[in-house]
Amino acid sequence: MLGYQRYLNSLLYAGVTTVLDMGNVHPYIQQLRHEIAAGRILGPRIYLAGPVMDGPDPFWPPISYVVSSEAQLPSYVNQLKMARVDVVKAYVGLSERLLTGLVREASKESLRVFVHSWSLGSADVIRTGIAAFAHVGSPLISDEAVRLMRERGVASITTLATLESFSQRRLDKLAFLSAPLVAQVTPPQFLAALRTFAAKAPTPAESTARARGLVQLQTAMRNVKQLVDSEIVVAVGTDAPYPGVFLGEGVHRELELLVEAGLTPLQAISTATRNAALLMKDTTWGTIAVGKRADLLIINGDPAHHIADTRDIETVILRGQVLNRKKLEFDPKSDPGFEIAGSIARE
């Protein structure tokens, strides 16, 4: 948990004033949300899912509720409700039966279920009553699934940047590590570790994995375009951090990937503003209007025609207050610091 303020600063420095945390150590993220809301810690507004709901062999044991029977669901959902989560996150280990039961119990508490992936078969997953997918996914989405999503109001978060990370396509050219949204908020040792990682020659297995990641990215881009063309709510997401996916800067990269996928710049921007608010069913932000939250990003340029202009930030306004972005930059004197352990630097 060391360095949390640096991560919050990275988000704000990039103009990200609202986030959705889709899985975390619950007391930690819950307290962080509370302290930010109380004004004792500077950071973006946090929506959270708390621990994820997974099957008997959880993918992320430290942050999971292990579900092996439907009998456990009422207690788990009640705990999440008492903890004031905003949504419930269902992970890949849940069977269709358990996922259906989770949706049923969550709805009793007026909680919506976001599901991690499409692995059960997208149409079948949609029929369980979920509210959204946490990732667009790389299997090619079927016309039936698109129809069901539109009929039932099921949304999706994007996270194309994660698939780009799997392909390591972005690490072919590392100039972006010197750009302000990365360089000004990231410890130098982290950037050095990523450069070392990028320079390492891949094994045959790694080359195969990278090629597979590139195909998955291209398929996910097709899916995003189809969802947007079908007028389904698609909201920006990054799943940061992954190699080459940074908190804050990753949102700007995601917008660029969405434009590469065929969205117009304004459609891409909408995924990070209006659509994000629609995803969270919150009418107090997402568009500029009298009475809405004064969270604003003022930039130099014309992002309606050049999406990369979102990076040229003039001013960030959070809850009506202009932020001093200089104070958000990384400062080794104030950061608690920690050794890079168990990371790409050690691989």
What are these regions (language model features)?
Residues 1-2, 58-74:
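Active-site mouth loops of central-metabolism enzymes
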Residues 34-52, 99-118, 155-158:
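Alpha-helix-loop-beta-strand connector modules within alpha/beta enzyme cores
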Residues 76-94, 137-261, 333-347:
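Active-site neighborhoods of metal-dependent hydrolases
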Residues 19-21, 46-50, 88-90, 113-115, ...:
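Hydrophobic faces of well-ordered beta-strands that scaffold small-molecule active sites
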Residues 85-134, 139, 163, 218:
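Divalent metal-binding pocket/active-site signature
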Residues 1-40, 59, 97, 122-128, ...:
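Metal-associated gating/positioning segment near the N- to mid-region
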